[in-house]
Amino acid sequence: GQEQLLTDRAVFTDAYAVIPKGTMRDIVTSFLPFWDDTRLWVLSRPLSGFAETFSQYILEVAPNGGSDRPETDPQAQGVLFVVEGAATLSVDGAEHTLTPGGYAYLPPGKKWALRNNTDKMLRFHWIRKSYEAVEGLDLPDVIITNEQDITPTVMPDTEGKWATTRFVDPSDLRHDMHVTVVTFEPGAVIPFLETHVMEHGLYVLEGKAAYRLNQDWVEVEAGDYMWLRAFCP
């Protein structure tokens, strides 16, 4: 169609990777132990020459599917972000319904369960990272919220066209990972080349953009995923 990006966009380099939505087909799905009626696409995972610090998956959970033992690594913390359907998250003896935009932070060692108790497909992102403990700092608390309940922070020198929805206070050093929603209005430009210590995974929720990654310009659209090595401009 006239709206389809036509360039051959899948690329894997030492500094970044672009995984277009068109590569996420039925034949490349994976499965996890203790998850019923669930399949996933592994967008990144710790691997030499690739993501070093985190894993990111897109999971599809069919009606009545889910897991009562989702996390098998007691050192792993996790973030859930729902993009379609509704998830029932059980944690600390309470049930929470996560709808699109729903966010949950789950500290390491926390027992939780997730089910799709609806008759519709559930799709969500699961980001996992081994927690780096620091003596004198407690584990972070569970956070359950929705992006609609958070006021985005407008970034400086962008005429209000670039904003970031932060689920965690950047000054809370109990957290060693952050998942945010970044919004660009039409015509918005990042006014400098970002170069910093944070390794990135970026999933395009909606819209289209042109990104400068290292020395290359790449086109991305809704459903595409990018991984950026630490310090990659």
Residue ranges of model-derived segments:
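Conserved short histidine dyad/triad with adjacent acidic residue
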Residues: 37-46, 55-74, 165-168, 180-196, ...
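N-terminal regulatory/effector-sensing and dimerization cores
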Residues: 65, 69, 76-78, 86-90, ...
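Glycine- and acidic-residue-biased ligand/ion/polar-headgroup-sensing regions
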Residues: 75-88, 92, 197-214
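Short acidic-glycine-tyrosine-enriched beta hairpin
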Residues: 93-108, 214-232
